[in-house]
Amino acid sequence: MKHVFLFGIFGWLLSFTLVAQTGIWQWSVPVHNFSTHPKNPESRAYLWIPGQCEQVKAILVAQHNMEEISILEDEASRQRLAELDVAQIWVCPSFNHGFDFTDGAWETLDGLLADLAEESGYKELSTAPLIAIGHSAAASWPYYLAAYKPERTLACISVSGQWPYHRDRWLCPDIWGERNINKIPCLETMGEYESAHTWSNEGLKERKEHPLLP
């Protein structure tokens, strides 16, 4: 059943269109940032829940970078998510761009989930599985969430993104230690003219080194 659910999620992402969009977000709360030096202390978390949803089964979570909002507000995307009882949370500005879990990233996310659960009345938001999505400079944060909280992470989506184990001083710091994201489904997208011809080699290398990565 989990695999069927995830197939629906990934199928939705690969087929979304930017032609028709809808910008309804029913609830929002200010974000209490637990970082020692938050870059965006004025961040706000916005929540969308399908109109006929009685109980949220999962949450698609995004921090604002560039393309995330276009994906989240796409009408066809939301129709498919509604069929799956998947909610959306969009945080703008981002609360912790790379999800540095050594600097309060999880505590911040956990807090806003609890606040939105209280505000909306959908109590399950505080415990529901999370599908993290990030684009470009924020493309690695889903993997960092998965590494820190694998028990809460249903899947990771990296748009124009990175491979999970790629490291960079600024965007993908080496803070995982012995953590891994084995058995957590991940989807990385890269355009044909967007370094795909070389970046695919890195993906093949990581799959070989981490055979339990779906």
Where are these regions (language model features)?
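Short substrate-entry loop that stabilizes the transition state in hydrolases
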Residues: 53-100, 165-166, 196
